[in-house]
């Protein structure tokens, strides 16, 4: 054991010495882990809601400005609570990037059951669960509870977090910071006798009515999780919920110096009841003299109110204007409204009725507008990294689109501010706009930063020389197919890598998506800008590999935005072909029943029917498969089951011209994928984890970098693109010794065609120079992990040796004892 301790000490010394050479920060003492329930315990100590005397600091902050790619979302902060108003796709990613702590969210308020408001909610809830948050209160339209049931179809049971749903008809909600009142508002355009729209009793699984007459069989019916209703639902697009939020009274601050001047016993136990009395507004008597509360305290803050209202179209204007609850806060109200947040299009803001309603709040009320006319960069890190990558290769790493404000809004007679990402309005201690946190996107600054990195310019020059000196291609390859990586990260959207989505542009007017994680449309929009409608109009199909949230929760927004794009292009609407596990039907059906009509958007081909040897009993499915092959000009679209979760698929696309693209989805190394992908032109394979984490890869059913490369080599793939990296490799993964001239790594917004295969591996040296600091940190973490593994292995071996050595010694003692006696006897 002494030798073992000595060995461990020497190994530790060597590694720590190396660590300090790489980064002096590694020698720092690690902080103890935080208690995940510390916030809850702090709240319990404060006592009942509203008894704390009011928050000292309260502000609203814009998370998303209402633009087409980001939706509208607000974050409200106090030292006691955190709130989120609306949670569309990408909100979690923005909060993570801009350090708005997700783990502290007490409440989520939803103004409408529309995908632009709830598209990121499923991912947000899963993240809150993982952070250990014990409870989150959700408020909004009546369909909210059914929506939370529906997401269990792909999330599984949401154990470990209590999701308390507050009905829109419930009385006010009160906590330590404020009281929130919900105001249901119904549009004038409600059909019939003003009853919520009833969804048709369409059988579960029949997605496109015009195509579903003979497309179903009993085996294709998806099974819903326990507790998820199969009954038809009641969705009500005519309902929005507005919120009036009233801050609690904040008692005045005790003036210590003034108290000393008046001879009060400051610094003794006797001062406590005096402070309590004057903060409650009571006078006190000291040495025969009456002292008024205002002599010892600053004036109390009665607590301002703010309003969050969504007015989606002109049909809601009159009901909003006539609402009696709003009227109580207008004019000479007892509780003045400091701020009204308007989630409303320009057509609503231009309506004279709505303008008059805004004016009735008075000249001292500020107004914040969130809509598609707001211009703001949200994903700053994404813009930064793309600008720097563009220096290496402008075609493979094209610049992202920036969006100026589209047009001047209507002239209003009230104080109006257009939303910008991270713009703040402080309600307490002083009411004011704060613009210091607003994002500014400065490409010149990003470029200068990259050019000053050690060896970056030299590595770029070396790459360009090697590209010029390399052998000329035997033949010029076509621009198509063109592969655009929209999301290359795994699990959750992060600041530099979004979750899975890859666009395959088969031709200038035909494309398909391989997986469609949350925020896919936003990535498309930032990549293509004003051309996004053209791209959506050319989208022929979507392949969903499996039902994990990071692979399919962007589908609904793609469907809705595609309908809008076809209308703007003047093209006839037709359902989108979706190749997916059958279980996706249950999710689409539930969302259709409770929230929005979406079933008419989809013609679904169960992925199992595209496996080799699959029997297709439905003529309708056969027709859809034929349509898929014809539209995409494919000879074959094949799927196979891969080694991940249940019903997880990979796919292979064989074009009529002969090229073959294979997509792994999520999987461990898989023989079925190797066989399906034989002689592929391009393999896109997940490489979630670095080499050395093979056990973790098995536990999580993913692949390491070298495992993915070996799959491609066994497949005899012409080229391998690695993607789906763990978010621990935020900017760049660790490079494996197995990297060669046939391997490249994918980045978000990277664009490659087959003619780029010789170029992509040559990008690795400048990439290493650009991300040298990140690579050093990852290598340091790997060294520490390897040291822990060596320690554990040596300790285990030493303990085993001790156990094995102990028994023979005892046996020898027993067997040698008689012999020694004989010797002594002689």
From Swiss-Prot:
Q: Name one GO biological process term.
A: mitochondrial tRNA 3'-end processing
Question: Which EC number(s) are documented for this chain?
Answer: 3.1.26.11
**Which subcellular locations apply to this protein?**
Mitochondrion; Mitochondrion matrix, Mitochondrion nucleoid; Nucleus
Outline the segment boundaries, as ranges, of region: Disordered: 15-53, 187-231, 798-826
Q: How does it assemble?
A: Homodimer. Interacts with PTCD1.
What name has this protein been given in UniProt? Zinc phosphodiesterase ELAC protein 2
The organism's taxonomic lineage, starting at the top? Eukaryota, Metazoa, Chordata, Craniata, Vertebrata
Q: Listed GO molecular functions?
A: 3'-tRNA processing endoribonuclease activity; metal ion binding
- SMART domains in alphabetical order: Lactamase_B (SM00849)
Q: Which PANTHER family match?
A: ZINC PHOSPHODIESTERASE ELAC PROTEIN 2 (PTHR12553:SF49)
